[in-house]
């Protein structure tokens, strides 16, 4: 298109009236469908293709016009725009007369101002025509072609609907206040239907559904919201009525599982699981547990596949393998054993230069302690001190299990004793090297060779005699030969090549545990592998928790502990048992799972033992021997190890007639609840190194509960043994008191036969037991009914005197018979 080419006018339809505007662009350039108003203000008309809206706005051309020209024609433009609005308003009323008048008025106005209008238009075109001429034809052709392609593929109804949406978008975009019905035809490609929107009528959801409707039948009927709602409800009912296909799952079943947990694992209703259990004859609710076999039957009946898992697998995480390259030399762990007062504690005092013996009672170590001694050459030795009384055999056994070397202390002036033999047996069972320290060599009149000979009897043979046991004479008091003892320990440890990995999660053994007011649970542990750090989560037996603080044997707080280092830790939820293995785990959940598993195992074991005891009691009752007495006890101690030792020793007391029952045992002072339990069960409360609280003492006085305090264990055991002995039935024994020879028989009226007798030995008493012998054969055993001296009744007749006797309910007596007289004596039994 050239500059001289004439531009044909374009019709713009307003209602039923047509108003001819000058200077529209050629229809072939549909991309620039716009109308120049009087003052060159551009009125944009959107040229839309169905499904693809293309709008080319020439506002830039408008903005680039001479601002002075626009201002001069502003008033004229407003007048023309007002006429257009009136025309649109009249088109709604469908008044042909008014529409015709407006049309004529517009034509007259057009002719009057044509010259000015033409000059303004020519100037605008002249300024911008050169810039857009090159692209105009190409853009317009492409748009028209796209419109034709898309229009041919879309139904007429849908075209009109989308055209409506386009028109609404135009109004919204350009802020047209009054909405006249417009009809615009561009090359007969797109027809915009007439739309009448009253100002008072609001836009509703139904209008949106109507515009977006895919109805191709051309019905044109608007669907109501109620109809749409009914259709949605129908779809919902259809979905609900469809039964979902059941999903069969693979269920992992542990050794014990709750009914509710099983239902969740299978995604089944709890009621269905309970029904299956009822079919198997089991009545259970959702909170109860069932065994793995029953759970497998239920899951199989419901169509699921089952995978059995051992609950003990939770402890597999505690298994750690050390790499050879990670191993490092560690300090030896030495256990000191021996008899009471043979000098074990004094030896430790001398080795670690501290005095702990002064606090002991009876020369006996009251609980296990662990100490680390650093030698002059920076080498270290860890010592574990076990008590010397046989009551602590179990504690010494645990000490032997964690030790590398055992030192058996023997007093040179006392020799081999019971605890010495016991310590030897523990060391042999542990399979560890033995060093015999012959103590107190500073005393006069000692015989070391005699000690060695006594040890030979127990297969403890020294190196000089071809054995593998080292004998070292020492004096703990005078500190004689202590350096030789240390050298022997280091020599054996080098031969053993003791190594452990300081890397990875720590593990070890519990040496001792207790509860201290203000500090909570205190646990002494020995690290055997890895490195224990503050903040680690550990599991020890059924106890677990986070390590809050670590204190070494010197009383200093430390941040980590390596192998062979004993430390006291805080943070466990309860008191573990001495000898329990401890392990560091990743998180508290793992520790809790392991603890719960171990608690269940302990309960099952306890139930099994209780069932066995009940069966034994039932058998005793069936046999008629139901005279079993019971001694209930409540034991409170300062440390957990003492509880185990006391309980173990008491339960070993032999008695088939007295059953010792420990109702409760714990660490800490005696409380009011302990007294209440003792009152209702008639138990004795025993406190070892602890005392009762004030309210507990008051309650004990009111309820007459027996509370006994002890600080030495063997005194406690002896007292309990005496109490049990007093509960035993006494032994009834015959005690011989004399013999009588029958010399003459007398028949007395109303009395019967009286035997004239002579007391040959001892003394006879009225009411005593008698045995009648004829030719040295016992023919009667009974009771002496009558004893007379001449005509007088007497209580007793001594040797060398004559008397008359008669038996109770027996008269077959003859001259020459011999009578043995005895008394029944009760003797108190001892355990």
Curated annotation (Swiss-Prot):
Residues 338-345 are annotated as: G1. GTP binds at residues 338-345, 385-389, 439-442. The keyword Protein biosynthesis applies. It comes from Rickettsia prowazekii (strain Madrid E). One of its GO terms (molecular function) is GTPase activity. Belongs to the TRAFAC class translation factor GTPase superfamily. Classic translation factor GTPase family. IF-2 subfamily. NCBIfam families: IF-2, small_GTP. The keyword Cytoplasm applies. It comes from the Bacteria. This is Translation initiation factor IF-2. Residues 439-442 are annotated as: G4. It is found in: Cytoplasm. Residues 475-477 are annotated as: G5. Residues 385-388 are annotated as: G3. One of the essential components for the initiation of protein synthesis. Protects formylmethionyl-tRNA from spontaneous hydrolysis and promotes its binding to the 30S ribosomal subunits. Also involved in the hydrolysis of GTP during the formation of the 70S ribosomal complex. Residues 363-367 are annotated as: G2. Gene3D superfamilies: P-loop containing nucleotide triphosphate hydrolases, Translation factors, Translation initiation factor IF- 2, domain 3.
């Amino acid at each position: 298109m050239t500059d001289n080419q004439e531009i044909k006018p374009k019709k713009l339809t307003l209602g039923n009236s047509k108003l001819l505007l000058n200077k529209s662009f050629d229809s072939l350039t549909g991309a620039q469908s716009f109308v120049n108003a009087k003052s060159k203000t551009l009125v944009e008309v959107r040229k839309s293709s169905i499904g693809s809206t293309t709008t080319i706005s020439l506002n830039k051309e408008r903005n680039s016009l001479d601002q002075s020209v626009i201002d001069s024609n502003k008033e004229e433009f407003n007048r023309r725009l007002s006429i257009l609005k009136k025309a649109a308003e009249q088109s709604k009323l469908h008044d042909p007369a008014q529409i015709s008048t407006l049309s004529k008025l517009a034509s007259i106005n057009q002719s009057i101002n044509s010259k000015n209008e033409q000059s303004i238009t020519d100037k605008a075109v002249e300024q911008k025509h050169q810039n857009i001429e090159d692209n105009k034809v190409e853009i317009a052709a492409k748009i028209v072609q796209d419109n034709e392609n898309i229009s041919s593929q879309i139904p007429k109804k849908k075209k009109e609907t989308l055209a409506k949406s386009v028109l609404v978008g135009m109004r919204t975009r350009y802020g047209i206040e009054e909405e006249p019905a417009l009809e615009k035809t561009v090359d007969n490609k797109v027809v915009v239907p007439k739309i009448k929107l009253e100002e008072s009528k609001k836009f509703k959801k139904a209008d949106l559904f109507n515009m977006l409707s895919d109805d191709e039948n051309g019905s044109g009927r608007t669907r109501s919201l109620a109809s749409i709602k009914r259709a949605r409800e129908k779809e919902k009912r259809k979905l609900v009525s469809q039964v979902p296909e059941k999903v069969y799952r693979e269920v992992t079943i542990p050794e014990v599982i709750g009914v509710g947990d099983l239902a969740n694992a299978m995604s089944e209703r709890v009621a269905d699981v309970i029904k299956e259990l009822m079919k198997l004859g089991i009545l259970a609710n959702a909170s109860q547990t069932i065994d793995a076999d029953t759970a497998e039957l239920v899951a199989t009946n419901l169509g699921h596949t089952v995978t059995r898992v051992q609950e003990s697998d939770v402890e597999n995480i505690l298994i750690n393998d050390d790499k050879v390259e990670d191993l490092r030399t560690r300090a030896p762990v030495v256990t000191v054993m021996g008899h009471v007062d043979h000098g074990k504690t004094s030896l430790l005092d001398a080795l670690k230069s501290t005095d702990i013996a002064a606090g002991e009672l009876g020369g006996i170590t009251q609980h296990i302690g662990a100490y680390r001694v650093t030698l002059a050459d920076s080498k270290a030795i860890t010592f574990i001190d076990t008590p010397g009384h046989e009551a602590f055999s179990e504690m010494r056994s645990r000490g032997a299990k964690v030790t590398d070397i055992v030192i058996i202390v023997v007093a040179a002036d006392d020799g081999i004793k019971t605890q010495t033999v016991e310590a030897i047996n523990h060391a042999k069972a542990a399979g560890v090297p033995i060093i015999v320290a012959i103590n107190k060599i500073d005393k006069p009149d000692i015989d070391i060779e005699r000690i060695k000979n006594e040890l030979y009897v127990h297969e403890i043979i020294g190196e000089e005699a071809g054995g593998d046991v080292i004998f070292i004479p020492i004096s703990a008091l005078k500190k004689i030969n202590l350096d030789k003892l240390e050298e022997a320990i280091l020599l054996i440890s080098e031969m053993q090549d003791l190594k452990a990995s300081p890397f990875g999660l720590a593990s070890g053994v519990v040496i001792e545990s207790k509860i201290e007011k203000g500090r909570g649970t205190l646990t002494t542990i020995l690290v055997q592998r890895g490195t224990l750090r503050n903040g680690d989560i550990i599991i020890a037996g059924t106890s677990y928790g986070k390590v809050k603080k670590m204190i070494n044997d010197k009383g200093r707080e430390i941040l980590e502990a390596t192998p062979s280092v004993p430390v006291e830790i805080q943070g466990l939820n309860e008191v573990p048992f001495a000898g329990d293995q401890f392990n560091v785990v990743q998180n508290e959940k793992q520790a809790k799972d392991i603890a719960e598993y171990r608690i269940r195992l302990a309960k099952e074991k306890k139930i099994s033992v209780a069932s066995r005891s009940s069966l034994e009691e039932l058998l005793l009752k069936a046999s008629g021997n139901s005279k079993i007495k019971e001694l209930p006890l409540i034991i409170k101690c300062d440390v957990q190890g003492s509880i185990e030792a006391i309980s173990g020793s008491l339960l070993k007391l032999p008695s088939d007639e007295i059953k010792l029952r420990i109702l409760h045992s714990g660490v800490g002072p005696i409380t009011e609840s302990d007294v209440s339990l003792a009152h209702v069960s008639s138990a004795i409360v025993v406190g070892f190194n602890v005392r009762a609280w004030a309210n507990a003492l008051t309650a004990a006085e009111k309820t007459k509960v027996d509370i006994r305090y002890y600080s030495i264990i063997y005194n406690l055991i002896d007292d309990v043994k005496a109490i049990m002995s007093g509960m035993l039935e006494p032994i009834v024994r015959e005690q011989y008191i004399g013999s009588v020879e029958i010399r003459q028989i007398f028949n007395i009226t109303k009395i019967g036969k009286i035997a004239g007798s002579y007391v040959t030995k001892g003394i006879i008493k009225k009411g005593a037991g008698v045995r009648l012998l004829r030719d040295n054969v016992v023919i009667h055993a009974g009771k002496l009914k009558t004893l007379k001296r001449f005509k007088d009744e007497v209580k007793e007749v001594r040797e060398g005197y004559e008397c008359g006797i008669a038996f109770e309910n027996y008269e077959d007596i003859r001259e020459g018979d011999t009578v043995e007289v005895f008394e029944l004596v009760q003797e108190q039994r001892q355990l």
